[in-house]
Amino acid sequence: MDTKAFKRSLHKSEQYHRKGFGHEEEVTNLLQSEYNSKLIQQIRNNGYRLQQGDVTIHLAEAFGFCWGVERAIALAYETRRQFPQERIWITNEIIHNPSVNKNLRDMKVEFIPVQPDGQKDFTVVGQNDVVILPAFGASVQEMQLLHDKGCTIMDTTCPWVSKVWTSVEKHKKGSYTSIIHGKYKHEETIATSSFAGTYLVLLNLEEAEYVADYILNPGDTPSEREQRRADFMAKFANAHSPGFDPETDLERVGIANQTTMLKGETEQIGKLFERTVMRKYGPAQVNEHFLSFNTICDATQERQDAIFQLVDEPLDLMVVIGGFNSSNTTHLQEISIDKNIPSYHIDSVDRIGPGNRVEHKPLNADLTVTDNWLPNGPLAIGVTSGASTPDKVVSDIVEKIFSIKSASAEVVGVR
């Protein structure tokens, strides 16, 4: 499919929208009342620190809602106001935050049902319905299906995600295989790969090193090459385009990324493949075999930079707040753990209690319960949150921490 031509056609359709409907002031006021926090603003104004009793909160200087998330939520709220009686669907969670998605459900925004085989059931969508595409975007196949149905589409895709789509389309035009640094099951990567031609999704630097080694050492004999190819295909069974052949499709590669991945790792992967093609084809041929554009999201970079700064503080523990399926939140937790700071990833204040107990998600593990997670005595606690987390959620958790440590330290009347 010529995805670029399809996007141009879709954007010209009267049924397609990616801007608001004139309800900005009303929606802005509503979002501020639902998601903002006077306490968090107070902490910002106080140099990102607040002490109550023997607890000092150190807040990251960049955290919480990014511009793309705020925009997506605002457009979803505007859509409901513009179409008060119509049936409204959304193809996925608008963002990875349970409270925001619950609010949309309360507004009678329905989620496209998922069948037992994992495929979405779009037969429920009627011609007169409205469908919201979330901040992560949607695959080009889903967009075409909805366009063909003739339903109204509100596209809240983050512009940074759209920028990555443009990059992989350039890879496709130049006959480069898109090496996508991301999680192959993540909604954003699914959407991005649908705009690519030939692609391979790599989770981390370790997988990238495996691929780089294959490029340089595919095997010396036919049997070795056959075995190495079979091992490669088994390792990346669910992470490549149909018909992908590592023997031919890794001769020309372009780098792209899921916007929420670790910035430093994406850069390392890009440099690794640049060095790899230089070794294989020579310095003069690098541009014939390697292509890279800067597709690292500013907001992701800012939040990662802020927690790198925060973990240099003498902290006793870190609280990382965000949806458990939020990629950018998970990476914030990784940074804290790499600094050997005890880290608790929670998605809401309801995970805390009763008493000095917390239900949290360790990195790459299931939910677990830890008792006495807040030690006695003075505590310096780092707090950050993913790009999909409202200030109000952070505020509730900070207040809960204060109340556990000392009843006299409860923050009264500041919200």
UniProtKB/Swiss-Prot annotation:
Catalytic activity, EC: 1.17.7.4
Residues bound to [4Fe-4S] cluster: 66, 158, 297
Binding site for dimethylallyl diphosphate: 96, 186, 326-328, 388
Gene Ontology terms for molecular function: 4 iron, 4 sulfur cluster binding; 4-hydroxy-3-methylbut-2-enyl diphosphate reductase activity; metal ion binding
Signal sequence bounds: none
EC top class, as a word: oxidoreductase
Residues annotated as binding isopentenyl diphosphate: 96, 186, 326-328, 388
Catalysed reaction equations from the record: isopentenyl diphosphate + 2 oxidized [2Fe-2S]-[ferredoxin] + H2O = (2E)-4-hydroxy-3-methylbut-2-enyl diphosphate + 2 reduced [2Fe-2S]-[ferredoxin] + 2 H(+); dimethylallyl diphosphate + 2 oxidized [2Fe-2S]-[ferredoxin] + H2O = (2E)-4-hydroxy-3-methylbut-2-enyl diphosphate + 2 reduced [2Fe-2S]-[ferredoxin] + 2 H(+)
Active site: 188
Pathway participation: Isoprenoid biosynthesis; dimethylallyl diphosphate biosynthesis; dimethylallyl diphosphate from (2E)-4-hydroxy-3-methylbutenyl diphosphate: step 1/1; Isoprenoid biosynthesis; isopentenyl diphosphate biosynthesis via DXP pathway; isopentenyl diphosphate from 1-deoxy-D-xylulose 5-phosphate: step 6/6
Function text: Catalyzes the conversion of 1-hydroxy-2-methyl-2-(E)-butenyl 4-diphosphate (HMBPP) into a mixture of isopentenyl diphosphate (IPP) and dimethylallyl diphosphate (DMAPP). Acts in the terminal step of the DOXP/MEP pathway for isoprenoid precursor biosynthesis.
NCBIfam families: ispH_lytB, PRK13371.1
Record-linked PANTHER family: 4-HYDROXY-3-METHYLBUT-2-ENYL DIPHOSPHATE REDUCTASE, CHLOROPLASTIC (PTHR31619:SF5)
Family membership noted in the UniProt record: Belongs to the IspH family.
Name assigned to this protein: 4-hydroxy-3-methylbut-2-enyl diphosphate reductase
Protein source organism: Acaryochloris marina (strain MBIC 11017)
